Amino acid sequence: MEGTAPPTPYDPASVARYAPEPDKRPGRTAFQRDRARILHSGALRRLAGKTQVVAPGEGSPVWDASPRTRLTHSLECAQVGRELGAALGCDPDLVEAACLAHDLGHPPFGHNGEQALNAFAEDCGGFEGNAQSLRLLTRIEPKRFTEDGSVGLNLTRATLDAATKYPWPRGAHPAVPASPKFGVYDDDRPVFAWLREDAPGARTCFEAQVMDWADDVAYSVHDVEDGLHAGHIDPNCLLADPEREAVFDAAVGRFVPAGTDHAELAAALDRLLAQDWWPHGYDGSAPAQARLKDATSQLIGRFCLAAEAATRAAYGDGRLTRYAAELVVPRETRMECAVLKAVAVRYVMQRTEQERLRADQRIVVAELAEALTARAPDGLDPQFRALFDAAADDRARKRVVVDQIASLTDASARSLHARLTGHP
């Protein structure tokens, strides 16, 4: 347990570590140490090589779009989460650490790679990026070792809990058992049970809810910004009914519940279009870029202030932490956020060339998994080679192969695939 705890209301259990450690420097909180460990991790650096929505090189030939990566998204999510969390009484370093950690388990090629790895790992427990994040934080990322092996970054209970978006194992979603979303693999259950001690059922802690909303806000706003920069989105299309209906179709069942009336989504979109800061055109000029940046700032402020006000209205002015409250996001605000996500899906991810690229990416991941399985331990990094040699059975060895692939960047996955298969 840390010798220096953050100010109340975080109790000693919240700042405990799975493997107890002495405090190295007085005056530094446990959550500040957690944040620093994540910032200095190789896993965070690797996110720079993982695409967010628009891959480098996909921008307009007229200007340098510098599209976001998973790393820049995580940094922006952390900034949004830190400020919203602080406004609601959370420890800001704790929320920032959770935001920085939330995508660490993301495999190459994003959710597309996640689907391909899940298919490959079906007989060893599947693959889910959030469960992989927990595995990375508590096992794979080298920082602390005990007699029983690696404990990963050995973060505090509260930080691990705040980084856990889906606090249940595969097939145990509290409302939809068939949901593909889960947050822990079977062989990581001991540390999961420890971090969830005294947690009420499948509830996420308040800081995890702040992290989750910060993630939604950051990627909904910035994915649209990147789509505009790259020339994939024409804001004027959102004024025409056929295009609007296509956006609403993309939202229903994906970002809002099935059966949501298109009229509710139309009202949400119209509220955004009516704002005087909404970008009704974009030509890449400096004034246009400034207007677009102002729009992104306005949207982030709009979404965060709505959540802050609604949560304060429900719980008052005290410090809201751990399991003392639920983040309240007005339905109208969630609808506005969902519409932005759907705009990015409709105009960026559903482009014909993107469909072809995603098919190619799935082939790369599937062939790479088979090639590594056939050659292992050859082809594995030294860290994973040792884990493969120590694995108790075929199921455990397959999980090591999955861990290796999940650690790769987009470019290193393609490079290793080409080297092992002979296919470019």
Swiss-Prot record:
PROSITE patterns reported in the protein's UniProt record: HD
Bias-annotated ranges (Pro residues): 1-10
Domain of life of the source: Bacteria
Gene3D superfamilies cross-referenced by the UniProt entry: Hypothetical protein af1432 (1.10.3210.10)
Keywords: Hydrolase
Disordered: annotated segments: 1-31
Xref: InterPro entries: dGTPase, dGTPase-like, dNTPase_2, HD/PDEase_dom, HD_domain, PHydrolase_assoc_dom
GO molecular function terms attached to this record: dGTPase activity
Compositional bias of kind Basic and acidic residues: 20-31
SMART domains found in the cross-reference section: HDc
Family: Belongs to the dGTPase family. Type 2 subfamily.
PANTHER family: DEOXYGUANOSINETRIPHOSPHATE TRIPHOSPHOHYDROLASE, DEOXYNUCLEOSIDE TRIPHOSPHATE TRIPHOSPHOHYDROLASE
Protein name: Deoxyguanosinetriphosphate triphosphohydrolase-like protein
